[in-house]
From Swiss-Prot:
Name of the featured protein: GTPase Der
Residues that, per the record, bind GTP 2: 183-190, 230-234, 295-298
Organism: Nostoc sp. (strain PCC 7120 / SAG 25.82 / UTEX 2576)
Keywords assigned: GTP-binding, Nucleotide-binding, Repeat, Ribosome biogenesis
GO BP, sorted A to Z: ribosome biogenesis
Lineage top rank: taxon: Bacteria
CDD domains for the chain: EngA1, EngA2
Family stated for the protein in its record: Belongs to the TRAFAC class TrmE-Era-EngA-EngB-Septin-like GTPase superfamily. EngA (Der) GTPase family.
Domain called KH-like: residue spans: 353-438
InterPro entries per record: G_ENGA (IPR031166), GTP-bd (IPR006073), GTPase_Der (IPR016484), KH_dom-like (IPR032859), KH_dom-like_a/b (IPR015946), P-loop_NTPase (IPR027417), Small_GTP-bd (IPR005225)
């Protein structure tokens, strides 16, 4: 992306994520009093003294333990260092150096990037200098006493850091498409992201809940830039403790809001679940473009009716996103994965599309001719005066009528179907705003008002 990268390294629970949030000016990396909360590489933009760069939050390093995720976390930290221009090694000033710090320091001395030693949790400036002095023994140069929570000392650290960052020679205007990858735990979201990125960017494991942060990955295809946001799987509320998992779900919903297009990942073996339906409803509520990705398609036993039956099931159970394209893929084998980005680009274009008022009213005129608006019990018929598009993302059309409450849900759905049949809008929700307007207000409008239906 053109910006230098700074990797944040350290053993568990020394305050790496807190420092990342301090440098980035926001709480995006999950911070919780539990060792090993951050498992993946989380990229955030940072800015200091007219210099822009990215900070990369990595999992807590442990070298003498190979249980559960720890070897994978080491792999992620090494990958972060390989793409970094510098590293900040975070240690705990309150506990002093220990054997784990010494192991990490020895490992960092073998890496080809400059390393800056941040002695965190030095809340008192006077006492902090004494605490930091104990870390000279790690052999990484000057220890910088800091408080990631309060910001003390971070300025001095950053002043020295930016001296070692390479200049940004060219930073192009980036017209990127932001994509949120969401779904229940263990449906293959991280495998899908890695298939896009061409590397093991995110820890992949059959253990549910492996990915906890919303993580941004940048890729480019055919001149188009994409920002991929992988999120923790979304579980039913009753199975969530109000700890780290709660914050991850909140982060996933925020990722939907950030996105231009959402990939709703369905497990082909499990089919559409109640939780998938709720996610589809969330996408609709947020007004986001969507592509439904049925993953693990390679594991499904197939006959000549399989795809037909599956499509019927999706249509029946995912009615919230019936307007979305569906693609059947295997993130493991790579089957049809690249095709997803084509659908994303198309959905994004439809999401931002604007239609002229004259075309909208031609559609309305045809729709009313084929199916007249409903009539009230008193014999008064509903009447659509005109329509005009008032916004995009999602496309939103205001319909001015004689009495909005006269138009029941069935007729409103009929009008939406007519817009879709005539104008497309594949991959994006559309919103219709029904507005009551008196006849005299319509007739006294300016000469430039929309064509009356």
């Amino acid at each position: 992306m053109g910006l230098p990268i700074v990797a944040i390294i350290g053993r568990p629970n020394v305050g790496k994520s807190t420092l990342v949030n301090r440098l980035a000016g926001e709480q995006t990396a999950i911070v919780h009093d539990e060792p090993g909360v951050t498992r993946d590489r989380t990229y955030l933009p940072a800015y200091w003294s007219d210099r822009e760069f990215q900070v990369v939050d990595t999992g807590g390093l442990v070298f003498n333990d190979d249980t559960e995720f720890l070897p994978l976390i080491r792999q992620q930290a090494l990958a972060a260092l390989h793409e970094a221009s510098a590293a900040i090694f975070v240690v705990n000033g309150q506990t002093g150096p220990n054997s784990a710090d010494e192991e990490i320091a020895e490992w960092l001395r073998q890496q080809p990037v400059p390393v800056f030693l941040a002695v965190n949790k030095c809340e008192s400036p006077d006492q902090g200098s004494i605490q930091a002095s104990e870390f000279w023994e790690l052999g990484l140069g000057e220890p910088y006493p800091i408080s990631a929570i309060h910001g003390n000392g971070t300025g001095e650290l950053l002043d020295e850091l930016i001296k070692h960052l390479p200049p940004v020679t060219e930073l192009e205007e980036n017209n990127e498409i932001k994509i949120a990858i969401i779904g229940r735990p263990n449906v293959g979201k991280s495998s899908l992201l890695n298939a896009f990125a061409g590397e093991e960017r995110v820890i992949v494991s059959p253990i549910s809940g492996t990915t906890r942060d919303a993580i941004d990955t940048f890729i480019e295809r055919d001149g188009q830039n994409y920002r991929l946001i992988d999120t923790a799987g979304i579980r039913k509320k009753k199975s969530i403790d109000y700890g780290t998992e709660f914050f991850s779900i909140n982060r996933a919903f925020k990722a939907i809001r950030r996105a231009d297009v959402v990939l709703l990942v369905i497990d082909a073996l499990d089919g559409v679940t109640e939780q998938d339906q709720k996610l589809a409803g969330r996408i609709l509520d947020e007004g986001k473009a969507c592509v439904v990705v049925v993953n693990k398609w390679d594991a499904v036993e197939k006959d000549s009716y399989t795809i037909y039956d599956y499509e019927k099931n999706l249509e029946a159970r995912l009615h919230f996103t019936e307007w979305a394209d569906t693609i059947y893929v295997s993130a493991v084998t790579g089957q049809r994965v690249e095709k997803i980005l084509e659908l994303v680009t198309k959905a994004n274009e439809e999401h931002k599309r604007r239609v002229s008022t004259s075309v909208i009213n031609e559609v309305l005129e045809d729709a009313v001719r084929w199916h007249s608006p409903p009539t009230s019990r008193g014999g008064r018929q509903g009447r659509i005066y005109y329509g005009t598009q008032v916004s995009t993302q999602p496309p939103t059309i205001a319909l001015f009528v004689n009495e909005a409450k006269r138009f029941n849900d069935n007729y409103r759905r009929y009008i939406e179907r007519q817009f879709r049949q005539q104008l497309g809008f594949k991959g994006t929700p559309i919103r219709l705003l029904w507005r009551s307007k008196k006849v005299r207000d319509v007739e006294s409008g300016s000469a430039n008002r929309a064509t009356r239906v």
